[in-house]
Swiss-Prot record:
It comes from the Bacteria. Its EC number is 3.2.2.23, 4.2.99.18. Involved in base excision repair of DNA damaged by oxidation or by mutagenic agents. Acts as a DNA glycosylase that recognizes and removes damaged bases. Has a preference for oxidized purines, such as 7,8-dihydro-8-oxoguanine (8-oxoG). Has AP (apurinic/apyrimidinic) lyase activity and introduces nicks in the DNA strand. Cleaves the DNA backbone by beta-delta elimination to generate a single-strand break at the site of the removed base with both 3'- and 5'-phosphates. Gene3D superfamilies: 1.10.8.50, MutM-like, N-terminal. It comes from Brucella canis (strain ATCC 23365 / NCTC 10854 / RM-666). This is Formamidopyrimidine-DNA glycosylase. The active site is at residues 2-3, 58, 283. A zinc finger (FPG-type) spans 257-293. It catalyses: Hydrolysis of DNA containing ring-opened 7-methylguanine residues, releasing 2,6-diamino-4-hydroxy-5-(N-methyl)formamidopyrimidine; 2'-deoxyribonucleotide-(2'-deoxyribose 5'-phosphate)-2'-deoxyribonucleotide-DNA = a 3'-end 2'-deoxyribonucleotide-(2,3-dehydro-2,3-deoxyribose 5'-phosphate)-DNA + a 5'-end 5'-phospho-2'-deoxyribonucleoside-DNA + H(+). Keywords: DNA damage, DNA repair, DNA-binding, Glycosidase, Hydrolase, Lyase, Metal-binding, Multifunctional enzyme, Zinc, Zinc-finger. SUPFAM superfamilies: Glucocorticoid receptor-like (DNA-binding domain) (SSF57716), N-terminal domain of MutM-like DNA repair proteins (SSF81624), S13-like H2TH domain (SSF46946). SMART domains: Fapy_DNA_glyco, H2TH. Binds 1 zinc ion per subunit. DNA binds at residues 104, 127, 170.
Length: 293
């Protein structure tokens, strides 16, 4: 399932084609995805201008000129495809002709951009685990999907001091604490494994046991920020279904230090250990027992 870097990459890919554009019409090819589409979904979007594209945790948000917002989640296999004349040469792009919709193209946004050029933004989702919901004017931050989300792990929002406060008194393992969306929003299995390796911390260690060690908290916060920033710069990680909005694959998976590397040498040159895999809360955890303590 796409994590924060993948969703941010999609947002950045869509932004030049969607922000400022007017929705001419929307093709809705089925009544539901994971959830039913909002009532009058296509009708309420027609004629609206897209003012901004945002992201909160793993959710893409589309903000319209009447105050309505779309909250979208890619699920397991969702992707957006851009078709526009100036997308010529990009995977999924077209020039002087309209491509044929595929079986799993469930929503097509027909847009008129500020310069008068047209574009189509196509949402494709074979497994249909994604969704698109509305948040009414002024209600986005209090939407049930968003209101309880924790701090974003980007920029300077996440610090050692913040982590220490979040982890204080918590008995759950570090990995479980980092995956708790109420504490830190947008982190997933891949990037938590990678950040813990960079910080030299065991995923099984109790979160509260390190909350008082400010140097450790700063090291972990820095590891999280750097992993997320590098993954965004690499276009995310393509393991199964994820592609960028222009059809390209992310390539951060080539930089994995532990994730998916069970039995292979640890990439810490001072270590000499081997990457191990254990299951925590039903998810695979990859780590090096030699250098993560």
């Amino acid at each position: 399932m796409p994590e924060l870097p993948e969703v941010e990459t999609v947002r950045r890919g869509l932004q030049p084609f969607m922000e400022g554009a007017t929705v001419v019409r929307v093709e809705q090819n089925r009544p539901d995805l994971r959830f039913a589409f909002p009532e009058n979904f296509a009708e309420r979007l027609s004629g609206r201008r897209i003012e901004a594209l945002g992201r909160r945790a793993k959710y893409l948000t589309v903000h319209l000129d009447d105050g309505l917002s779309i909250i979208s989640h890619l699920g397991m296999s969702g992707s957006f495809r851009i078709e526009a004349e100036d997308a010529q040469g990009l995977p999924g792009g077209f020039h002087h002709e309209r491509s044929k919709n595929s079986l799993h193209d469930h929503v097509v946004f027909h847009l008129m951009r500020p310069d008068g050029a047209s574009a189509r933004i196509i949402y494709n989702d074979p497994r249909r685990f994604g969704f698109m919901l509305f948040a009414e004017k002024g209600a986005l931050e209090e939407h049930p999907l968003l209101k309880d989300l924790g701090v974003e792990p980007t920029g300077n929002l996440l610090s050692g001091e913040v982590l220490a406060a979040l982890f204080k008194g918590r008995r759950k393992p570090l990995k479980a604490a980092l995956l708790d969306q109420r504490l830190i929003a947008g982190l997933g299995n891949i990037y938590v494994c990678e950040a813990l390796w960079r910080a030299g911390l065991s995923p099984m260690r109790a979160a509260g046991s390190v909350a008082g060690e400010m140097d450790v908290m700063e090291r972990l916060a820095g590891a999280i920020r750097s992993v997320i920033a590098q993954a965004i710069a690499a276009g995310g990680s393509s393991l199964k279904d994820y592609i960028q909005a222009d059809g390209a694959l992310g390539y951060f998976q080539h930089s994995f230090s532990v994730y998916g590397r069970e039995g292979k040498p640890c990439r810490n040159p001072a270590c000499g250990g081997t990457v191990e895999r254990v299951v925590q809360s039903g998810r695979s955890t990859f780590f090096c027992a030699s250098c993560q303590t």
